Amino acid sequence: NSPGTISLGQGVVSYPPPPQAIEQISQFLAIPDNHKYQPVHGIVPLLDAIATKLKSENGIDINDNQCIVVTAGANMAFMNAVLAITSPGDEIILLTPYYFNHEMAIAMAGCTPVLVPTDENYQICLDKIEQAITDKTRAVVTISPNNPTGAVYPQAALEAVNRLCCDRQLYHINDETYEYFTYNGVQHFSPGAIPDGSDRTILLYSLSKAYGFASWRIGYMVIPQHLFVSVKKIQDTILICPPVISQY
C-alpha cells in the first residue's frame, strides 16, 4: 500500500530466477524419470556443480572427511544439523541478534538456545562465547554475512570461533545464506576454508537469496563425513529427497 517503500521485514530479493532456470522447466517436465524420487542427498550433477562452486568461490576443497547434502533450503539444513548433533536437553549457542528460525529449530529439537551478545558493532565477542559453554553445549552458530544485522565477521574472528569449537569438541555451524551480500570492499570468508577444521564445521547455504529461488526451496549443507548417515536418515524421514525440479 506504500509504493516505493522498501520492506526490511523479510529477506526477499527484488529479482526473479535466472531466465535459463525457467527455460529448463519444460525440458525437465518432459522426461518421465524426472517425476520419480531421486537420491536423498541430491542428484550427482548438482552435487558436482556445488563442489566446483565451493572450491572456486569459497576456497573449500571437499575432501574425504566432508560431504555435501542438498536440502530444501538453508532452514532445513539447519534443522538437519541440529537433529544430527543433539539430544533433548542439549544447548546451542546463538549470537544476538539472532535469526528467529534458528531459535525455533533448536526448541523443536528439545534443546535450549543460549543467547550470547555481540559488541556494539554486532561483532563476535569470543570471551562471552567461552563463558557460555557448558557440558551441555553442542554447537556455536555464526551467520556471516549476518541476518538480521548485516554484519560481516572478519576471517580472524571466524577462525577463532572455529578453533574454540575444535578445541572443545563442539560443532561450528556457519550460515552463509547471504554470502554474496557484501559491500564497500568487505569480503565474505567461509570457515570451511580453515585447514584441519572440517571435522567440526557445518556450513549452510541457500539459493533463495543469490538466485531468487525462494519458492523453489533449494539449498545445501557441507558436513563432516561422520554425520552423513544421520543427516540422510533425518532428511529421508522429513522430505525423502530435495525438490527434484529445483535441482535441475
Tell where the protein language model's regions lie, with residue ranges.
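N-terminal small-domain helix-loop-helix segment of the aminotransferase-like
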Residues: 1-72
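Short acidic capping loops at alpha-helix termini that bridge into adjacent secondary structure
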Residues: 62-68, 88-91, 136, 198-201
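A short helix-loop-beta submotif of the ANL/AMP-binding
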Residues: 108-114
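Conserved core segment of the aminotransferase class I/II
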Residues: 194-248
